Amino acid sequence: KERIITGSGSGSGSGSGSGTGTGSGKDAGYTPTMQRALPWILAILAGLVLALAMPGPGIWPLVVVFPVLLLEALDRTRTWWHAWLLGWLAGTVHWLAATSWVYDVMHHYGGLAAPAASAVLLGMALYLGIIWALIAGVVFLVPSVWRIWFFPVAWVAIDTLRRFQPYQFPWNDLAATVAHQPVALASLPVWGATGLGWALVAVGAGLWGWLRRDRRHVSAVQLIAAIGLTISMSALSPGFESAGAPVRVALLQPGTTLEEKWNPGEFEEIADRVWSLTRRAADAGAKVVLWPESAVPFRIDTDETYRRIVTELAIDLDIQIILNSIGGSSGNAFANSAYLVTTEGISPVRYDKVHLVPFGEYVPPWAEMVTTGALVREVGRFTPGQSATLLPSIVPLGESICYEVVYPGHSAAAVKNGAEILITLTNDGWYGHSWAPDQHFAQVRLRAAESRRWFARAALTGISGFVDPYGRVPERLEVGGQGFLIADLTPIRTVTPRARWGDWWFVLCAIGAVGLLIWTRVRPVSPLKEA
């Protein structure tokens, strides 16, 4: 498959305001058993509908339904502990559904028996569900009427913590649900995916309030604010300034399965496939060719034959090759690295992956007992890179390897360092035909729109593709496909507010959440009267 594309550039309960009550009006007709069960049912549905809104199922309008369900569940409980458990249940259900592919990774490729793989998935879901529990517990501390405004900022302030230790798993942020809608991405250069995520939750919280007649005046303000701010941020978003002539870039997708990759008898055929695709891409006019992560089963830092073949290929075809290989680091450690090969040889500047994959490239100490050698090669010996080093290609390239494209700050750092085109090399072969490839690719669209950069993604088994500075995808190679794509990518020097100022909307939400929490706890009477 060969394609050439061209792109240009109240019941507030107790006097403290922390309870909610379950007014008899809205529970009329429910038996006591139903009244007790309903919050749990609503919590389960909240987690499930958000999973269905994510890429894969892609029923994106459900993203504004989950706040309605979760807030209603919290409004029907009387104790903080109950609210905390409801949030934990909702979060656990969400991650069980949204990342169900973890079972296949652990069972099929990790060598774990089915019960053990199921236990890993459940443990992961319970662990990530704690974030939802924290959100629910904090939201419960606020009087019911204030939750319309408080829930969105609390969600952003707490859920964003998944980017940091001990989680380091910012997978499936809310903006990913609308990553396929370029109009929805128009505001990202200003407030990033964090801001758009807040707007989606704010709309959902506003809809919950609108369904309560006594709160429609509050919800109307919320809805107007969320929609108005999104439109305003879109209007304030900058265009982009070209930094030079377009660069013709090719993406290879060899389609090599992990079973082939781990079979020494297949090594020669795997390499020949990559050489052939590279030559065909060069014949089509490519000047820079991107190989995906783990494209060939050799190490460029220790295998002299491999180094010679790749260098000769670059010289003979008059191209530059960006490839992935394990690279030696200090001591006996290793880095997951990206190398630039030119007609002058292998560049001394390499990029070492900064954000390593939990259970893939390192194992948290508490989880070492469930890790197998088949899943984690040289586990514990990978060391993270220290910065978003640019590859000095025809234009400066900002690199992400596989999983770390889910970190907004990483691409932003590359842009601030001078990257004019962003690239990512990945091996999504672990995921098969699950929801994961779509979830992963959605993050590339978000990063492209946030940074106003062309983003090129080469994936071993798919999805490969080019994403333009507005988050649109001219064309892509699907999972299981084999071939290459070529596009003329415009280098861009514009630095967006999101890249320049960092995740400023997260900071505002954190301040707002703390401020609202204190305000509602110390003020004896809410300025907003509930009917």
What is each stretch, according to the model?
Residues 5-29:
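Small-residue-biased low-complexity repeat regions
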Residues 28-35, 241-245:
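Extreme N-terminus of proteins, especially the signal/transit-peptide cleavage junction
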